[in-house]
Amino acid sequence: ALSQQTAANHFDLVRFVPYSMPSLNIDMIDCHVDLFDHRFKWPVYINAMTGGTNKALEINTLLAKLAQACDLAIASGSLSAAIKDPSTKESFQTLRKHHPQGFIFANIGLSYDALGAQKAIDILHANALQVHLNAPQEIAMPEGDKDFTQWGKNLQSILSTVKVPVIVKEVGFGMSKETIHSLVNVGVNTIDVSGTGGTNFIQIENQRAGGGIQGLENYGFSTVESLLEAKNLDVCVLASGGVRNAYDVVKCLALGAKMVGLSRFFLDVVVEYPLEEAILRTKQFLTDIKHLMVILQCQTIADLTKKPLLFDPLLLSFLHQRQQ
């Protein structure tokens, strides 16, 4: 999965207007975010990745220790495996074991109703629940669920029953304004647009025997396009999908994201380096966000949302067509 990144991410098509006379220093920068009745120290979180195997136990333990050391929120991979096979629970519960006071998102798909969602929350003593939308992935998987007739009913069941905040997230195909409107209409108030540019599940399935849909590798909206789609809609927006570095994070925040999720960056750092080095590199990444805010003359996240942005003609064309 680490190499499956063929669809566009578009972050390089967004530019800030430079400002050459900043009057801030790093100690003046306030990166905190208030969300879900919680104050997050940083506007980034470790997004959903893995669980259910011995390797996942090892990786999730490292990610949880990293989150603990850097005061970051973290999301689990889909807890479907743990619900179906309780013997795999430990590979998920290591998140709470090693990040006992941390903010943890459980993750479940819409093949589950409120009962399954609550099981997922209980396994992690989770602070919030990600409900993922992955129809293209399911269609492309030979063993995937091809019947989505219960998705709407299950989502309404979850929204009306669970007591923790619910985030409806894509899994790398982005969200259109039509999707967002339909979610808001059933009571969703927080989304993670999760656009193209990160892990490409269609490409992964296309490389499996008997799976995939050829030609669908570039299906979806990029994270940037999805953030533009969500502009001025009555919903709290989180961003993920192909976010590579601190500069991409800052661009997401400027485009209106409340927080930004990264998977690849954090997975790479814990796989490639000893934990202490991974912690140092993560702290440098977080410091880079503040450094970028200094040169942009932005003391808070709210200041970033007021910065003028320049778009490449490709994005201007997208905006023009989507405003018709």
Regions found by a protein language model. Give the residues of each.
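Acidic (Asp/Glu)-rich catalytic clusters
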Residues: 34-38, 62-69, 92-100, 118-125, ...
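Glycine-rich phosphate/ribose-binding loops and adjacent secondary-structure elements
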Residues: 150-272
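Active-site cofactor/substrate anionic-group-binding motifs, chiefly glycine-
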Residues: 34-81
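Hydrophobic faces of well-ordered beta-strands that scaffold small-molecule active sites
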Residues: 44-47, 72-77, 103-108, 131, ...
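Conserved, mostly hydrophobic/aromatic
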Residues: 46, 67, 129, 191, ...
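Active-site-adjacent beta->alpha loops and helix N-cap segments on the catalytic face
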Residues: 55-57, 80-97, 111-116, 137-160, ...
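An N-cap/entry alpha-helix motif that binds or orients negatively charged groups
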Residues: 1-36, 40, 314-315, 320-323
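C-terminal extensions of enzymes
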Residues: 1-2, 266-324
